[in-house]
Swiss-Prot record:
Pfam families: NDK. This is Nucleoside diphosphate kinase. Homotetramer. It catalyses: a 2'-deoxyribonucleoside 5'-diphosphate + ATP = a 2'-deoxyribonucleoside 5'-triphosphate + ADP; a ribonucleoside 5'-diphosphate + ATP = a ribonucleoside 5'-triphosphate + ADP. ATP binds at residues 11, 59, 87, 93, 104, 114. Keywords: ATP-binding, Cytoplasm, Kinase, Magnesium, Metal-binding, Nucleotide metabolism, Nucleotide-binding, Phosphoprotein, Transferase. The active site is at residue 117. InterPro entries: NDK-like_dom (IPR034907), NDK-like_dom_sf (IPR036850), Nucleoside_diP_kinase (IPR001564), Nucleoside_diP_kinase_AS (IPR023005). Belongs to the NDK family.
């Protein structure tokens, strides 16, 4: 597998409960390196633009409210097959369906407050990374 980068967000439900370190440990234990990371408080407008692909979905407004309700940690993860590996570590969107040992199985509170976001493809990873980071901030 090729070395690749993916984008991750540790969401407000997890940052409120001080789970950033525990979640980062899961990434690192799986062989992913954190090559960029910052804690930010997204505005509702930033969240809306980031999740614009979901604008027509019934949960869009609630998602934007949630993502701007408290700080998040945005990060770039690097490793062999990083996109697929991150999605495996995160677990299913619904924590009730997430495999034991995954981030969502251990930490998520609900489908809406599921602790993490991860890119689903190389194209979206590149777009999502560029939304939050300049090339100078990627220090892997």
């Amino acid at each position: 597998m090729a070395l690749e980068r993916t984008f991750s967000i540790i969401k407000p439900d997890a940052t409120r409960r001080n789970l950033t370190g525990a979640i980062n440990a899961k990434f690192e234990e799986a062989g992913l390196r954190i090559v960029a990371q910052k804690r930010i408080h997204m505005t509702k407008a930033q969240a809306g633009k980031f999740y614009a692909v979901h604008a027509e979905r019934p949960f869009y407004d609630e998602l934007c409210e949630f993502m701007s309700s408290a700080p998040v940690v945005v990060q770039v993860l690097e490793g062999e097959g990083a996109i697929a590996k991150n999605r495996e570590i995160m677990g299913a969107t619904n924590p009730a369906d997430a495999a034991p040992g995954t981030i969502r199985a251990e930490f998520a509170e609900s489908v809406g407050e599921n602790s993490v976001h991860g890119s689903d493809a190389p194209e979206t990873a590149a777009e999502e990374i560029a939304y939050f980071f300049s090339g100078l901030e990627l220090v892997g």
